[in-house]
């Protein structure tokens, strides 16, 4: 079955701090960030911050919260609206566990079309949200960009995706050279241009199984034997330790020991209490040979989620606004 829109959820990270980078970000929690709710991600901007300027980071996860272990394919992530206030937001892809001081990715951003563009054009001039874009460089050579005068959720207007072959910055003015001519004409008043992060597939992942046993075996080559479930998988390093020929304990580096043991005589599917669904499954058919006390299997799981860092910059002297917002859009396919 395909992944449904309502099965794609934004979730917060476990840690939030504006003073200790090592305490900001981290792993995904299973709370939900509801779109349109005040302070769902960032706190209010104080008068002191508006006067002096400020930068804050917040981490979120876009979780494929589907009971079907189907991958979200041809994933595209982009900012689809300008902030109405004087601040601006870019996003940077993260890792399942990184905190603010470990952010290593590059930013992605958005701009408004500055000059009308005709069908067949191979160059765009856009106005970025701030001259700081010249330092951050959220548009880069080789990027896929979205050019559109319609909402990301659909409706009237046009949308197209094109690669850029060169970028130049002059303050907030950004010139983009296109690898292929545009198929449509666009007007400055209604057209936004976004740099796009891409991934071929997003799904739970079961990786790096290592079995330590002299006479036991694990079939890692048969599809479906080892599953990290979209709904319940977390970022974890797991160790299964055999108690005897059939039963084993299950522990994770972050979770510690799970209360219920597993057995090679049945599928092992320990339940994530936050989602009431399994973290992972090891099929009984994947085991063979003879095990003994002390044998171990270690492996890693990764959640079916995109870790995203939002960076909000409030330039010095910014005006106040009661209903500020930033909008990140996701496009993908499933079968």
What positions do the PLM features span?
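Long, small/polar-residue-biased beta-strand-and-loop interaction regions
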Residues: 1-116, 144-148, 156, 187-196, ...
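Membrane engagement elements in two modes
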Residues: 1-24, 142-145, 164, 170, ...
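Short, flexible surface segments
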Residues: 52, 138-141, 293
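Intrinsic-disorder/low-complexity, polar/charged segments enriched in Ser/Thr/Lys/Arg/Asp/Glu/Gln
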Residues: 55-59, 121-125, 173, 237, ...
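Short, conserved beta-turn/loop elements at beta-strand boundaries and strand-helix junctions
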Residues: 67-68, 82, 166-174, 245, ...
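Autoprocessing Asn-cyclization modules and mimics
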Residues: 97-188, 196-236
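Polar low-complexity, Ser/Thr/Gly/Ala/Asp/Asn-rich disordered segments used for subunit assembly
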Residues: 109-119, 192-304
């Amino acid at each position: 079955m395909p992944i449904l829109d309502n099965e794609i959820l934004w979730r917060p990270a476990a840690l939030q701090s504006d003073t200790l980078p090592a305490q900001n970000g981290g792993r995904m929690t299973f709370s939900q960030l509801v779109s349109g709710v005040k302070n769902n991600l960032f706190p209010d901007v104080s008068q002191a911050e508006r006067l002096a300027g400020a930068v804050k980071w917040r981490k979120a996860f876009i979780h494929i919260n589907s009971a079907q272990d189907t991958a979200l394919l041809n994933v595209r992530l982009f900012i689809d609206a300008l902030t109405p206030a004087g601040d601006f937001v870019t996003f940077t892809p993260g890792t399942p566990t990184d905190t603010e001081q470990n952010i290593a990715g590059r930013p992605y951003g958005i701009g408004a079309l500055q000059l009308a563009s005709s069908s067949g054009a191979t160059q765009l001039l856009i106005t970025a949200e701030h001259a700081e874009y010249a330092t951050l460089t959220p548009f880069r050579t080789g990027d896929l960009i979205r050019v559109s005068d319609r909402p990301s959720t659909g409706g009237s207007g046009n949308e197209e995706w094109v690669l850029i072959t060169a970028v130049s910055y002059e303050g907030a003015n950004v010139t983009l050279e296109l690898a292929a001519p545009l198929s449509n004409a666009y007007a400055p008043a209604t057209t936004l241009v976004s740099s796009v992060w891409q991934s071929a597939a997003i799904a739970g992942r079961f990786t790096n199984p290592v079995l330590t046993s002299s006479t036991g075996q694990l079939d890692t080559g048969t599809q479906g034997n080892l599953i990290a479930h979209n709904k319940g998988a977390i970022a974890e390093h797991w160790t299964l330790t055999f108690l005897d020929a059939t039963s084993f304990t299950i522990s994770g580096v972050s979770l510690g020991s799970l209360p219920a043991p597993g057995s090679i005589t049945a599928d092992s599917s320990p339940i994530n209490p936050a989602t009431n669904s399994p973290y992972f499954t090891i099929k009984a058919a994947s085991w063979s040979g003879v095990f003994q006390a002390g044998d171990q299997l270690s492996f890693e799981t990764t959640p079916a989620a995109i870790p995203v860092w939002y960076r909000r910059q409030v330039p010095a002297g910014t005006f106040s606004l009661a209903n500020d917002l930033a909008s990140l859009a996701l496009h993908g396919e499933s079968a």
